[in-house]
Amino acid sequence: MVNQTHEFLLEMTGVSKEFPGVKALDKVNLKVRPHSVHALMGENGAGKSTLLKCLFGIYEKDEGDIIFLGQHVNFSSSKEALESGVSMVHQELNQVKQCSVMDNIWLGRYPTKGFFVDHDKMYRDTKAIFAELDIDIDPKVKVATLSVSQMQMLEIAKAFSYDAKVVIMDEPTSSLTEKEVNHLFTIIKKLKEKGCGVVYISHKMEEIFSICDEITILRDGQWVDTRPLKGLDMDKIISMMVGRELTQRFPEKSNEPKNVILEVKNLTALNQPSIQDISFELRAGEILGVAGLVGSRRTDIVETIFGVRERSAGHILLHGREMKNHDAHEAIRNGFALVTEERRSTGIYSNLDITFNSLVANVDEYKTPYGLLSDKKMKSDTQWVIDSMRVKTPSHQTHIGSLSGGNQQKVIIGRWLLTQPEILMLDEPTRGIDVGAKYEIYQLILELAKKDKGIIIISSEMPELLGITDRIMVMSNGRNAGIVNTKQTSQNEILELASRYL
């Protein structure tokens, strides 16, 4: 049980951090009470990650105080923070996938019997934690067999096993179904009842209003305000985050779909369960949305078109010409581009610079007759990506991993535009990106549509699909349940179609 003598479990006051040429944090405050869920919000690049890295000792703060349970602390590592009672459940989960569930929970502090690990005690202790958190996972199975949501539950159980007083959750629902989100909220409420303070980082407003008690907002590395959520509305939070009233969530649509450029006929993937008998058309200058519940195989469509998933039947015609697209290289040559869902694992090379990340899909274009790379053309194309995509970065040499999520996504879109595609496919293009950056991505997509690109967007966010698409194809259990005109449809009609083949 958490010591109740302190008004705040964690107090970070006046925290500042400067990098060469950039003031990342300027006197930022974060105060977390026991028995509460505290939202930490701000646009990508507002300083949330830097603040938490200062807490966990990954960065050394330049000034400011951190008080935990009434004591001044300066953690030197996340391990020290965890052992002291401050835990973080990351957006990117850190687990040893070839080890068992219970191994992952007790790694580095196994219970022993004499000289040997006491596996029975480890199993019993894991079961006890799972019972308390209502988690139904076999402690002996390998982590590699778990779903993303189960891995997330495992991270929370690990924090619980350390008797964490403060648990920080970074975009915890980004890959969860509605049912799994509800289970997560139940667990958060249990942590709250125990006296924990939960710091909840999310861009999903409905979650913030559903689960949080207080909110701290950062903007451009500065603390804007800390308030109880009661009495606040979405517009007020957005205006505090972006420093201005965001009158529109979506730009004005001015693209005009023209002639049909892509025809997909009876497309079926080889390895089932997957897509079956998918047919649709895409026009030049059209934005086609793909909706569906989790597990409806939306991603399989673009993967099959792009050649990374094998097909057993069907035809793909671009300007009336049959496209085989046996692999991604052939698809790129044929004028297709795919921005994948998992930006961090399959999109960016986080330890490499913006130049590499901008040019990697188009390397052959930079080869001179002597087989060397043309430095001049590489520099000019990287600059084109930065300028045309409006990427905020200190230089070409900046590691892409240090950019905000919105800027990373802009680089990836720019990378694919350098291949001069006719068909641009985007899978969850604004996942984990803040409100202001989303608007910029929408502007880019609409500008591309006005240049007669054919665009396919997969999204789990219904307002996004209704806000920027021309038509929406609804997937249900691997099949096309119907295509609707965006202006004439409703959320209810889309949800009805999404459950047609369940």
UniProtKB/Swiss-Prot annotation:
The gene is mglA. ATP binds at residues 42-49. It is found in: Cell inner membrane. SMART domains: AAA (SM00382). Keywords: ATP-binding, Cell inner membrane, Cell membrane, Membrane, Nucleotide-binding, Repeat, Sugar transport, Translocase, Transport. It comes from Vibrio cholerae serotype O1 (strain ATCC 39315 / El Tor Inaba N16961). This is Galactose/methyl galactoside import ATP-binding protein MglA. The complex is composed of one ATP-binding protein (MglA), two transmembrane proteins (MglC) and a solute-binding protein (MglB). GO terms for molecular function: ATP binding; ATP hydrolysis activity.
